[in-house]
């Protein structure tokens, strides 16, 4: 049974939302999980990826590669990592695009906005844990 009636489970609508998403929506969709150390430190599970974060690829052909994020290509939903390149036939090098779902964040670039985001997400998690679930027996 569907839990939220405002969210469509239609393939057609999901694809349309994916391909017509604005840059701000794509930023949220391009989130990645935090490493275990960062997760325990900040009490946050995932964050949107940004330039200068350090990541580790955990699945795909480039598994176990680590590096700094050089660019977030929102139009293609990929990120570029500094040490992941391929040499083309003409001798030039090109970046390999990696899906954000295939990486985990190992080191964050923190500025005042990112710190505020972490604090805000941590506060909502703490508030949810403080709530007591009450179940009513209907007989």
Curated annotation (Swiss-Prot):
Signal peptide: none annotated. Residues 1-25 are annotated as: Disordered. Keywords: Ribonucleoprotein, Ribosomal protein. SMART domains: KOW (SM00739). The keyword Manganese does not apply. Coiled coil: none annotated. It comes from the Eukaryota. GO terms for molecular function: RNA binding; structural constituent of ribosome. Transmembrane segments: none annotated. One of its GO terms (cellular component) is cytosolic large ribosomal subunit. The keyword Ribonucleoprotein applies. PANTHER family: 60S RIBOSOMAL PROTEIN L26 FAMILY MEMBER. NCBIfam families: rplX_A_E. Belongs to the universal ribosomal protein uL24 family. This is Large ribosomal subunit protein uL24.
């Amino acid at each position: 049974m569907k839990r939220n009636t405002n969210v469509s489970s239609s393939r057609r609508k999901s694809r349309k939302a994916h391909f017509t998403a604005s840059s701000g929506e794509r930023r949220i969709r391009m989130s990645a999980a935090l490493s275990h150390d960062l997760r325990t430190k900040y009490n946050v599970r995932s964050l949107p990826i940004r330039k200068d974060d350090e990541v580790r690829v955990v699945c795909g052909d480039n598994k176990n590669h680590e590096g700094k994020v050089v660019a977030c290509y929102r139009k293609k939903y990929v990120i570029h990592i500094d040490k992941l390149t391929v040499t083309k036939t003409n001798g030039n090098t090109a970046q390999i695009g990696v899906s954000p779902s295939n990486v985990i964040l190992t080191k964050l670039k923190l500025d005042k906005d990112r710190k505020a985001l972490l604090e805000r997400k941590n506060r909502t998690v703490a508030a949810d844990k403080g709530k007591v679930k009450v179940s009513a027996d209907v007989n």
